[in-house]
Structures are given as C-alpha cells and as structure tokens.
C-alpha cells in the first residue's frame, strides 16, 4: 500500500479498485511504450541523480520499491550523534515544523476566493506553530507585471497575513526548473509534442478533472526524422510520459486529502502524458510548483479544490525527481450569489472593492470567517484572533462550494 493511500485498508482497496474499473472503462490506444524493464532502469537512473537543488534537511525519504511507483513520504530525522544521551536516544523524533505557503499569481487583483485560500493556509500553519513562505507565481506573460505583484503583497500585509520567508519570484528560478527538466529528459521520460490546443480540442477527447483534454499520445512514438521535420516548422512543447494503461499497479496515484479524503487517479486514462514545458518555452505549472515546494521546504499545501485534480501529477513528478510529498488540503470554492465561481477576470469581489466597503481588515476577515463557518459569527476579528477558531473539522463539514451572501 502506498504511504499516501486511503486511511484504512478497506477504503484503500475500494479506492484502488474504483480506479482500475474507471481505467478499464476509459482505456484507449496509445503510442509505443517502453517495456517494464526499460522503464525501471530509467527510473533507477533518475533516482540516482538526486535532488534538483539543495533542500533544507527537514526530512528524509522513506522510499518504497521504485519499480512499483509507490509514493515517497517525508519522515522526521532522528539524531545519530555519538554523544546523544541515553535519555534522548530512545525518544521519538521531533516532528519537522509545518511550512505552509502563499503562491498567488499577479494576473489581477486578489478576489475574495483568493483571500479565503490565503487565510486558510495561514490559519492552518499558525495553528500548528508553523511558518509561511510567500512565492509569486509569475511565469506566464500575463503575470509579469511588477505593479500587480506589489499590489498583491500590499493586500496580504493589509490583511495581517504576514509571512516568514520570501517573497520569491518564479521568474528568478528558471535554472531550477531547467535542471529538473533535464533530469526527466536524461531518463528518457519526456518527448516533444507538436499538437496545438486547437488540435487537441478538435479531437473531441475526454477531459481531465482540470478541464484539459486527456492526451492520447499522438506524438509519443514519433521517429527522430519526423521530430526534426516538425521542429523546423513549429517549436514543440515537452510532455512527460506516464505509465501505460496496462500497467495499473504503476499507473494509479493515491493520496489522502485533508478535506476531501482518499483520492486516486489512473494517470494514463484520466490525465495522459502531460506538459512540463509549453511550446513558447514557459515551464508548466506542474513542474514549477513541485520544484519550488521542495526547495522551499513546504510541508503543507492549502489551496482551492479546483486544483485537486492537479495533485496526482504533482505527486508523480515528486516521485520521479526524488522530492518529498507535502500534505495536501484543498478547500471549497467561493461562489457568487448567482452561482458563478469568483474570477479575477470578472473583477468579482476584488480586494480593492472589499477594502473600500469594509474599511478595516478585521471587519472583512470577521465577515469572511463567519460566512465560511470558520468562526461562529461575523464579528470583526484579526487573523491572529481567528487562529483559535480554525479547525480542519470545520472545513471538512463545509466542503461543498460556498455561496457568498450580501453583508
């Protein structure tokens, strides 16, 4: 059983069985697949390369059989110093400190849903005596606006959601993503893909949980000559191979989400080979966040449930790169009164309007905490005052998307 399987053997068996049934119903033709022996050799080669960047010694990895692709889990390190006292030699290891993170994208003004996500991440870390890292995810061209990043940082400070480390900017960390990509390429786990977005959608393929078409491997088996010919016409993207559909023991990724419980995904049938770099050279979200979370020592990821479907891909990447897997906790989305998901594009309840309306961070946070069930009422409260009210049991009890009502 994977260390990130369901909470009980019975639930784990049920979850795994459901994934296999779902995979069988949705199986499809795929390109040439390396043999199990070849893939095992490549994975061993990849594992021997080590981490992509120095990582603080917060944890070591307990690794299952790499051929089975079980997920690695971080465990606390016990001291082996020769002068350790007898009294402490048999004591349990001190748990590693909780490290949470804010990872907003400066693509527009924060809206109420972004505030809720940051608040939950902050409250969870602080309630466990942990730390917060601030990372600005600005790889995409639409996010490369310094004034929006500065506004985002100012908004977090106004809310009283202080951080202990950062801000880090992804645009300054491209060498780390390049190193990780080279590890995957050297192991033979990637290939160039020339499919356009229009071509993928035109194929009428089923879609993954995040809305992207499930990739059927059109470019997986291209010859070197064909790759050269197409490269002369169009810059390719880079895709990561996932285990074949007939390799279900390898294909299923299982983990337990702190809010939504046992999760499993058969990568081949529910995701397909996925992008690690776009055709314009921008590193894909999945690769960048995996590298950054590990390099920054993040042990807990709190984010909206719209990213729940990305988690199996990130766990798979963590395993291939020899990186620890943090604990995942996804939270419900906030919806407008007419049932729409809040969006920066639509300027729904953005923080500029909210600051003007509520006047103080205490009034806004108190109202938000009361609306989402974190606090028993909408009394104005500071973020620090909300720590005593925060509980993951409350979040689990309200895990359906939350419709916000007028004050």
Label each PLM-derived region with a short phrase.
Residues 6, 33-36:
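Intrinsic low-complexity, disordered N-terminal segments enriched in polar/charged/small residues
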Residues 149, 174, 197-200, 212, ...:
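Alpha-helix initiation and N-capping motif
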Residues 2-5, 14-22, 26-28, 39-44, ...:
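Low-acidity, Ser/Thr- and Arg-rich intrinsically disordered low-complexity segments
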């Amino acid at each position: 059983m994977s260390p990130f399987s369901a909470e009980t053997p019975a639930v784990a068996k049920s979850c795994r069985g459901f994934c296999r049934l779902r995979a069988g119903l949705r199986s499809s033709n795929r390109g040439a697949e390396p043999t199990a022996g070849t893939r095992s050799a490549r994975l061993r080669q990849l594992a021997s390369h080590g981490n992509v960047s120095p990582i603080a010694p917060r944890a070591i990895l307990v690794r299952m059989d790499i051929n089975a692709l079980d997920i690695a889990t971080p465990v606390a390190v016990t001291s082996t110093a020769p002068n350790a006292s007898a009294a402490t030699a048999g004591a349990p290891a001190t748990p590693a400190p909780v490290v949470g993170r804010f990872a907003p994208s400066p693509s527009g003004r924060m809206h109420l849903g972004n505030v809720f996500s940051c608040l939950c991440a902050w409250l969870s870390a602080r309630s466990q005596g942990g730390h917060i890292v601030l990372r600005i995810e600005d790889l995409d061209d639409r996010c490369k606006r310094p004034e929006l990043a500065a506004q985002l940082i100012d908004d977090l400070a106004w809310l009283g959601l202080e951080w202990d480390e950062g801000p880090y900017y992804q645009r300054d960390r491209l060498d780390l993503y390049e190193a990780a990509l080279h590890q995957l390429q050297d192991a033979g786990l990637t290939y160039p893909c020339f499919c356009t977005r229009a071509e993928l959608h035109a194929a009428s393929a089923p879609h993954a949980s995040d809305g992207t078409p499930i990739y059927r491997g059109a470019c997986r088996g291209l010859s070197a000559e064909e790759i050269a010919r197409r490269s002369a016409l169009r810059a390719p993207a880079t895709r990561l191979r996932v285990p074949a559909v007939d390799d279900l023991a390898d294909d299923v990724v299982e983990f337990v989400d702190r809010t939504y419980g046992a999760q499993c995904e058969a990568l081949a049938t529910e995701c397909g080979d996925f992008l690690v770099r776009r055709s314009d050279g921008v590193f894909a979200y999945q690769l960048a966040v995996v590298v950054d979370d590990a390099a920054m020592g993040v042990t807990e990821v709190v984010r909206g449930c719209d990213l729940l479907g990305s988690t199996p891909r990130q766990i798979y990447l963590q395993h291939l790169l020899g990186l620890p897997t943090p604990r995942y906790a996804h939270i419900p989305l906030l919806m407008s009164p007419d049932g729409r998901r809040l969006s920066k594009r639509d300027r729904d309840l953005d923080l500029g309007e909210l600051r003007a309306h509520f006047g103080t961070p205490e009034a806004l946070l108190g109202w938000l905490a009361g609306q989402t069930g974190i606090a028993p009422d909408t009394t104005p409260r500071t973020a620090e005052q909300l720590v005593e009210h925060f509980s993951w049991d409350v979040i689990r009890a309200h895990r359906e998307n939350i419709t916000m009502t007028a004050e």
